Amino acid sequence: MVINQRSIRTIFKHSVLAALLCASLPSVATEKICAIYPHLKDSYWLSVNYGMVSEAEKQGVNLRVLEAGGYPNKSRQEQQLALCTQWGADAIILGTVDPHAYEHNLKSWVGNTPVFATVNQLDLDEEQSTLLKGEVGVDWYWMGYEAGKYLAERHPKGSGKTNIALLLGPRTRGGTKPVTTGFYEAIKNSDIHIVDSFWADNDKELQRNLVQRVIDMGNIDYIVGSAVAIEAAISELRSADKTHDIGLVSVYLSHGVYRGLLRNKVLFAPTDKMVQQGRLSVMQAAHYLRHQPYEKQASPIIKPLTPKTLHDDTIEESLSPSEYRPTFSIKAVD
């Protein structure tokens, strides 16, 4: 077939126009994942954030991150769920402020957007549970149990009464309730005696005030607490010249607790591998949206840590790099 010059120019012109039009249109839609945390006040959730951000970059998805500012802020988190849907999220990863917060009304906040629970247990009724497409996390009963087991083995029945104070965080939020239950179960046949329990949100100043009250009691052998409480206790015990009088046991790991373990200021902390949990949650959402197989219930293995058992691979799966700062938005690169 013979094509004259005019036809060639016309074809070329139309080809250029088509190319320009295609260039001006978005590429194949990239998945939009919205992640909501209870807070970013400590390095636990910072490490979850690092895991999510690094996995979002690996998976090539858009990630938006919101945080509620604390476990008491249920209404703020509800508004953030609505913001995620307004943003056009294809999936929502939810670290709930309360296990029962959305038990009967999750759909009213997210519509039909698929939800993936991360770290904190999310209890839903039969109707709401159709939205739940994946869960990542460990049962924090076992985090508390590991901490209690460590102390029970050091102070078995008949060894002499050992007094402890509990500073586990907010009374009924996050993993506090299962941690408390697990801890009590582990120490029930030991000489561990709980003198008092103090409750407050995981805010540095609130926990520092509680630590000072415990020090003033004068009869405490160990403080068992959240990472925020234990980090505060390290400095407060040093100031009070009581570092060698009161032992510190954390019920989870943070950067400050890790440094305390390295320096023998903290005796014990279990880790549920926060970085790994963040990665797994994004992986679940991305695979679901791409119709790829994935593990619907993913749970890292809890590792007990002492100053003598700090393995690099476990720490890398648990803590963000020291220079890392919270990241709230990742845009996929075409």
What is each model feature region?
Residues 32-51, 55, 59, 64-80, ...:
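Extracytoplasmic "Venus flytrap"
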Residues 34-37, 88-96, 114-118, 165-168, ...:
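Periplasmic-binding protein-like
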Residues 44-61, 143-150, 174-192, 232, ...:
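Short, solvent-exposed amphipathic alpha-helices that sit
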Residues 63-88, 196-217, 230-233:
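Structural motif
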Residues 94-111, 183, 200-260:
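Hydrophobic alpha-helical
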Residues 99, 104-142, 254-267:
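Flexible loop/hinge segments that line or gate small-molecule binding clefts
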Residues 134-162, 207, 253-257, 273-290:
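Hydrophobic alpha-helical segments within soluble ligand-binding/sensing domains
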Residues 167, 171, 276-334:
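Hinge/cleft segment of the Venus flytrap/periplasmic-binding protein
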